[in-house]
Amino acid sequence: MKGSELRQRFLDYFARQGHAVVPSSSLIPADNPTLLFTVAGMVQFNDVFLGRESRPYSRAVSSQKCLRISGKQNDLENVGPSPRHHTFFEMLGNFSFGDYFKKDAIRFAWEFLTQEIGLDPKRMWVSIYEGDEQIPADEEAHDLWLAYMPAERILRFDAKDNLWSAGDVGPRGPCSEIHYYIGDDPDNQVPEGVNSEDDTYMEIWNLVFMQYNRDENGVLTLLPKPSIDTGMSLERLAIVKQGVFRSYETDLFTPIIHTVMELLGTGSDHYQANSSAYHVVADHSRSIAFMIADGLRPGNEGRSYVLRRLVRRAAYFGQTIGFKAPFLAETIATVIDMMGAAYPELRSKQAYIAEVVTGEEERFNKTLAGGLRQLEAMLPNQADKAVFSGADAFKLYDTYGFPLDLTERIVAERGLTVDLAGYEAELEAQRARGRGAAQFKKGAVTERWAERNLAPTSFTGYNELESWGHVLALEFDGEELGTVQRGQEVAFVLDRTPCYAESGGQMGDSGVLVGPHGTIVIDDVQKPVPGVFVHRGKVSKGSVSLGEQVTVTVDAARRRDIVRNHTATHLLHRALRDTLGDHAEQKGSLVAPERLRFDFNNQKGLSSEQLQQIEDQVNAWIRADSKVEAAEMALPQARELGAMALFGEKYGDVVRVVTVGCGNASDHIHTNSEAPVCSRELCGGVHVARTGEIGFFKIVSEGSVASGVRRIEAVTGRAAAEWVSQQAQLIRTLGDKLGAQPGKVEEKLDALLLDQKARRDEIERLRGEIAAGQVDSLLAQKIEQAGTPLVVARVEASDADSFRRLGEQLRDKIGSGVVILGTVIDGKPLLLAAATADQVKAGRHAGNLVKALAAKVGGGGGGRADFAQAGGRDAAALDQALAEANGLL
């Protein structure tokens, strides 16, 4: 049974038992900073179990994407040599939130394993909790299991194996593990094999019975609504059901391994000699595909660094078996072919995944050769030592991008180990330096700025783009100086400035400072301490000193682009609420000079009609040239006016309210033709004086950023004009290619599509006629074999679907008999067998016929008694296999 079928059968079985089928959550846990990655199916239900969240269902089932590659649950080093360890795996799980408990959980598990997928009960063992001074032995589970298996197969273990807890405080409970014997001879089973080093006894399913709660004082109480959390590895279940010993021999991995062999042009001997490297590539290809699909990119911190390690580790092992150029996009394409139906995000992001992983491989390949040379140069310095320098290991990582585990592997081949303490010391020193360099990142609050107790900066930029001020602080490379010189990248604070500091989504200004002896080009302005505007820039001329009076001028063109976009976000917000409802509140924004980005609450994507309506409304308000005003007032007064406060922002007693329109008709110049706008928001940003200054508003994209949160990106002013010009040029180019005037491009495309459809319909009609003729021709070849009408033939088929349809048509038209067909598609042999109902009753079995024939072409398969298909690897053996088909009856 294929892995994909096992997954679907699991979901379908529990759906029939009243469980809501819940899609897998992301590998990146939502709102859980304690977890680097999702490691179990229950992670997405954690708040439900803890009573913090309610769902519209009380029982659920899922197939959860999981990654175990860090901390205690780190399988990375075992991946490759181990037959069953993986970084990525799928956890099948069923869950009860105060609904059913042990009786049904055990019944469901037994029914699924023995009845739904046909596992042998005589190979099954279960474990229960033996109890301790606080939690008694789980006699309830023991007695429930007795209904399904003899007492000698119900084993008792301690807390290490059979007690689950969420931590020192919180829910906990006994668990019951289901183990399966995969050895050759079931008569050799002994109880001592369970939870031992004997890997012919394999745990496949863990049923957790959450029935207690432990408080801060260590006191245990029964939960008012006990719950169920179960987990079963699809990879392990495939081992059991497919009758193999290693997960890499299941169909969850063999297609990836075959892709590697095809790319290298190698055979089974090469694979057997280098199986660990093949397994690393196969395992990591799955992890990499899902990590990128879930939004990660390779980097040097946190989750991004884990992804970089995996890509580079896979690339390195690939090179050890013969790859010279990037190859992971090809193995990942196989992963997507296999898993894209179950996880559509893989297919939708396939091109992006390939681009990201290939780029990272190329970067690694550029540094690998130099890194290896550097490592070789370092090794003589380690003479007569058993430990490789941690400082050198860090240099390989920092300069050449060598992950630590890669260095460990290479030096281990020379009999050395890495000084991990020294490596960590170097890494922490770099992080400390990085924290100092990161002072201008958004939201960064540097302790040294707070300690200086600087007076709040007076912002003059609401009314002017140039003003004078005095230098209060100067900083270079983290140190406070009295004077900064040409060429230095500096930070400085003035007592007053026209430059806006980044906040509320609006980017900081750029500009120039001119003093009596020097000039600083300003790149950015931030507020690391409330009220203190820290400017960042480079001294381009002379020097600047503390106390000097200077003149600061804002980049006017950039500021105009920013204010257009900022006022446009207010208009967009108003239009969204008017179109979608008041729930469409702002969740975040970016106001940059070249574009605006606006995140808002909405459960589903917007239709083309809705987007056009919103865009038209905003442009109507722009054409109305309504007045934009700002006023400071008490917070209660602002609320009385209906001013919107945004996404949990904290406000003082006095707030700034930006109002667009909302006044008399005279506030809107074009009141005869346009509906006036009325928008009031609490906002500290800078804006246009009238909406007409925005010029033009154009939505360029709409999509999802999180559950229930949508994002619109748009352009205004100069950027909008450029966008429209680019689109017009695109239409002209398409017109040239289609031989049509720009205004006729749509008409020409419609005509081409209609013609294409007509041709496809004609092709399908002709295929139908050919198939009908082929059916009649094949029926004419019918023979009698052992009293059974039989058609055996090799046929031509364009694809697997047409091959299957031909077999079904023959079976339906033969009346009574058996059909056996073979074909070759893309160089691979395919076989099918079909039997009419009366022949099935007479004992004919299409699945058995196909299984026997598939073995002759180097494949396997089977299926139902009335219809079955199988594939193989040896197309040259197909004719001989068909020639021997008669003898199978």
Swiss-Prot record:
Q: Which GO terms describe its biological process?
A: alanyl-tRNA aminoacylation
GO cellular component terms, alphabetically, are:
cytosol
MF terms from GO for this chain are:
alanine-tRNA ligase activity; aminoacyl-tRNA deacylase activity; ATP binding; tRNA binding; zinc ion binding
Q: How is the cofactor bound?
A: Binds 1 zinc ion per subunit.
Spell out the reaction equation it catalyses: tRNA(Ala) + L-alanine + ATP = L-alanyl-tRNA(Ala) + AMP + diphosphate
Q: Does the keyword Protein biosynthesis feature in the UniProt annotation?
A: yes
Residue positions annotated to bind Zn(2+) are 566, 570, 683, 687
Q: What class of enzyme is it?
A: ligase
Its needed co-factors are: Zn(2+)
- Domain writeup: Consists of three domains; the N-terminal catalytic domain, the editing domain and the C-terminal C-Ala domain. The editing domain removes incorrectly charged amino acids, while the C-Ala domain, along with tRNA(Ala), serves as a bridge to cooperatively bring together the editing and aminoacylation centers thus stimulating deacylation of misacylated tRNAs.
Q: What does this protein do?
A: Catalyzes the attachment of alanine to tRNA(Ala) in a two-step reaction: alanine is first activated by ATP to form Ala-AMP and then transferred to the acceptor end of tRNA(Ala). Also edits incorrectly charged Ser-tRNA(Ala) and Gly-tRNA(Ala) via its editing domain.
Q: Which family is it part of?
A: Belongs to the class-II aminoacyl-tRNA synthetase family.
Q: What is this protein called?
A: Alanine--tRNA ligase
Organism field: Herpetosiphon aurantiacus (strain ATCC 23779 / DSM 785 / 114-95)
Q: What is the lineage of its organism?
A: Bacteria, Bacillati, Chloroflexota, Chloroflexia, Herpetosiphonales
